[in-house]
Design a protein with these regions (language model features):
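Structural signature of the two symmetry-related core transmembrane helices
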Residues: 130-145
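A membrane-interface helix-boundary motif in multi-pass transporters
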Residues: 11-25, 205-224
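Helix-loop-helix hairpin linking two adjacent transmembrane segments in secondary transporters
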Residues: 1-43
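Extracytoplasmic gate region of multi-pass secondary transporters
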Residues: 61-114
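Intracellular juxtamembrane helix-capping segments at the cytosolic ends
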Residues: 166-181
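A late C-terminal transmembrane helix in Major Facilitator Superfamily
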Residues: 180-213, 217-220
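Helix-to-loop junctions at the C-terminal end of transmembrane segments
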Residues: 115-127, 208-209
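Juxtamembrane intracellular "pre-TM" segments in multi-pass secondary transporters
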Residues: 38-68
């Protein structure tokens, strides 16, 4: 969806801006209907003697749960900051111009799609925790060089590499939660982690207002390093069944 949506909206926008907005609204309604009709009963809870469901809150005492939440927080922060600010950064710096700048998100999600399909069907992780460390290091290195890019080709290539390295982090981290995964635990982990996608782009904007967008984008190296640190901490912990 993220790969194809920019093309769909661009096609609708050629007809009229109103149609593009209507297409977006229709897609939002479809998402709402999917959530509305998804069964979510019974998982992560047990029945008490009175017959009422008793929610299992034991995951809140797990250090691994909070480390994985922190890792996902950094992943969301780094990824959404690039998604939200990179077009503005590329255009403002003159690195990428014209229609290509608008399709940087498509480049990212194209890399994400390719990487996740490879992980799922061709090269599945035998040691997912160590793989998260490697992915975190890869994201940090590629983002550093992305900020040094001064040509259109290098920028697109490094953006693809950054997204490729980031692609497996989210599903691998969620899968690493093991039996802690439930409706209740995910209802805490995912919103808490998603706050990174709100906070970091805001921080970049505030820094950009005072020191320029290049400095703001440089701040995004912090959650990239956070990915590495949290991944190392998770890798050192004993697995929880």
């Amino acid at each position: 969806g993220a790969l194809l949506c920019p093309f769909l909206i661009a096609a609708a926008g050629r007809v009229s801006t109103g149609l593009a907005l209507l297409v977006l609204a229709a897609l939002g309604v479809i998402v709402w209907l999917i959530y509305l009709t998804t069964p979510m009963d019974g998982q992560g809870s047990t029945r008490s003697k009175t017959g009422k469901e008793k929610i299992d809150w034991s995951f809140l005492h797990s250090v691994q749960f909070w480390l994985l939440t922190g890792l996902l927080f950094c992943q969301n922060a780094a990824e959404q900051s690039v998604t939200g600010w990179m077009v503005t950064y590329f255009k403002g710096s003159g690195i990428i111009t014209g229609a290509l700048a608008a399709y940087t998100v498509t480049v990212m999600w194209g890399a994400t799609l390719v990487a996740r399909l490879l992980i799922a069907f061709v090269f599945p992780f035998k040691q997912p925790r160590k793989a998260m460390v490697v992915m975190g290091v890869g994201c940090t290195i590629f983002y550093f060089f992305l900020m040094q890019a001064h040509t259109q080709g290098a920028a697109i290539l490094l953006l693809f590499a950054f997204a490729f390295a980031m692609a497996g982090m989210n599903p691998t981290a969620v899968a690493s939660a093991g039996k802690m995964t439930s409706v209740t635990s995910m209802g805490i982990m995912l919103p808490a982690a998603s706050s990174g996608a709100i906070l970091m782009p805001w921080i970049i904007g505030r820094v950009a207002e005072r020191a320029g967008l290049a400095m703001g984008m440089a701040c995004n190296i912090v959650p990239c390093i956070g990915l590495v640190l949290f991944a190392i901490l998770v890798a050192r912990m004993p697995e929880e069944n």
